[in-house]
Regions:
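Bilobed "Venus flytrap"/periplasmic-binding protein-like clamshell domains
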Residues: 58-62, 72-89, 125-128, 143-197, ...
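Extracytoplasmic small-molecule ligand-binding "clamshell" domains
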Residues: 34-120
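Ligand-binding clefts/hinges and TM-proximal coupling segments of bilobed small-molecule sensing domains
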Residues: 33-37, 173-192, 227-232, 262-298
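Periplasmic-binding protein-like
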Residues: 58, 141-152, 198, 216, ...
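A ligand-binding cleft/hinge motif common to bilobed small-molecule-binding domains
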Residues: 106-107, 121-133, 177-184, 202-239
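Bacterial N-terminal signal peptides
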Residues: 12-27
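Acidic, polar ligand-binding/catalytic clefts
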Residues: 81, 85, 92-160, 230-231, ...
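Extended ligand-binding regions for polar small-molecule ligands
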Residues: 33-37, 43, 74-86, 152, ...
């Protein structure tokens, strides 16, 4: 039905995709005192200063955003806070404070790569090209690209966007996906790049564009604010795999982060986390498979 997001996949499809996803997980060997931390690892600075710098975006609701008190909140923010607690315990630190570093969709990767932040927690999709600059943790979410339109429009599927204007946030995987689908389906539409999701939603509501393509749950976060004005198309244009952004080549830090994630997934609290941030719903079969794969043993 138009305007509703369906995240549950058939069992056969979910099983197949889960098998593929299995290759994307790296098992965190148990950390021990006998495993020395390399001198150039971010862990050295984190342990010395007892501060870990986490980059976040304010426009990635419900994965990362600011509340009325200007405090970072969201699904991935919660996960990263659990990881920080784990790192503190892994290295027996008396305290480990979080320094929040605001970033944009354009600066999120460079902030980690240049050392302004130790990790980025939001809605960043894993791609091979991005691994040339930064690294990723094990997967924390699986999503798909969708399109939001005005509820009173005559657009009912992606094919109806022929001859229309589609907004995408510049530099996102969604931009690439939309262009690929337009070419694949031989559709002539104009792709309009914007700086962030707020600008895209404003353009859609003002009639400056006919659709806004992004990750479906991010679109749902915008739709819930304007339930009567906006509708979600049924098309799934791609599978987006989210992870925490980490410094490239820092295996020790990545191991510590993945250990924290594995501990959280094994604790069996993933459904509570999902329900908190995704409108009280339950994770679909594919996401449940991801959570199961994330319960890596020490």
């Amino acid at each position: 039905m138009r305007g509703k997001c369906l995240y549950r996949l058939g069992a056969g499809i979910a099983f197949f995709l889960a098998a593929v996803a299995c290759s994307l997980f790296v098992s965190p060997a148990a950390w021990s005192a006998d495993t020395p931390v390399p001198a150039d690892s971010r862990l050295k600075t984190i342990a010395a200063k007892k501060v870990i710098r986490i980059a976040y975006r304010a426009d990635a609701r419900p994965f990362a955003f600011l509340n009325d008190n200007k405090e970072p909140l969201g699904y991935t923010i919660d996960l990263c806070q659990q990881v920080v607690k784990s790192i503190q315990e892994q290295f027996k630190l008396p305290e480990l404070k979080i320094e929040w570093v605001p970033v944009t969709v354009e600066t999120r990767f460079s902030a980690v790569a240049t050392g302004k932040a130790d990790m980025e927690c939001g809605s960043s999709t894993v791609t091979l090209s991005r691994m040339k600059e930064i690294d990723f943790s094990n997967l924390v979410f699986v999503e798909s690209t969708g399109v939001l339109v005005a509820s009173n429009s005559d657009i009912h599927s992606f094919a109806d966007l022929a001859g229309k204007k589609i907004a995408v946030v510049s530099g996102t995987t969604n931009e690439k996906v939309v262009k690929e689908h337009l070419k694949l389906r031989n559709l002539n539409a104009t792709v309009v790049t914007v700086k962030d999701r707020d600008e895209a939603v404003a353009a859609l509501e003002a009639g400056k564009v006919d659709g806004f393509a992004s990750d479906k749950l991010l679109l749902a976060g915008a739709q819930v604010k304007h339930p009567e004005a906006l509708a979600m198309l049924p098309d799934d244009l791609s599978i987006e795999q989210y992870a925490i952004v980490l410094p490239r080549g820092d295996w020790a830090f990545r191991l510590a982060v993945n250990t924290g994630l594995a501990q959280f997934f094994r604790a069996g609290k993933t459904n509570d986390l999902f329900e908190r941030w995704f409108f009280g719903s339950r994770p679909g079969l594919l996401l449940e498979a991801l959570y199961a794969l994330g319960r890596i043993s020490d």
